[in-house]
Amino acid sequence: YAHEHEVEIIGDIPIFVSLDSCDVWANKKLFQLDTKGYPTCVAGVPPDYFSATGQLWGNPLYDWDYHKSTGYRWWIERIRRQLTMVDYLRIDHFRGFEAYWAVPAGEETAVNGTWIKGPCEDLFLAIQNALGKDIPIFAEDLGVITPEVEQLRDMFEFPGMKVLQFGFGDMDDRNYVPHFYTTTNCICYTGTHDNDTTMGWYEEQPEMIKDRIRRYGNTDGNRVSLDFIRFCMGS
């Protein structure tokens, strides 16, 4: 129905799954669990701009060595299944494939975690070999992004993300302002599920930032949501 109306659907898939999911229950060897089925380490991200204690997600981590021994079959089937329902697939926390933040089970914050090397290109080469080289994947490449993460993304020509609010807000990062993009291989977002709505965000900004947006877009700011869409479309 969507295709008949020239609409394409973008799906969204998290890198990690929940401890109480059927994925973990049915595939315990794929995860870092103890003999009772509890995680030995859990997922999260270190302290950053958004949080002084990081984010403790609590998901069980993958046993990547075991995944490799299976030819990454579980991941291949996961991607294959998702692409039967959508045209494109955004993978959340893409940087976790290059290196992931492992927090010892029982910690109350993510502060005491450690960066552990992920499967890197080995995983995506296996997915390409099974599903073809032109797999329609977007990489959520926000947060702590290193040159190694960018290299992994670019090796497979996965589009990254540009969030307009990051370019005009107090982060003041020109990499997210359309006319400063250094690549066309990216997806421009007005915001994400982690952001306020565009109008809500705009109304909370100091007058200096509001004025900057109005001057950048030659607009009065009364329809800033549509202005941001225009910025994206003109990028």
Segments from the language model and where they lie:
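Conserved, well-ordered alpha-helix/loop/beta-strand core segments that scaffold catalytic motifs
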Residues: 1-14
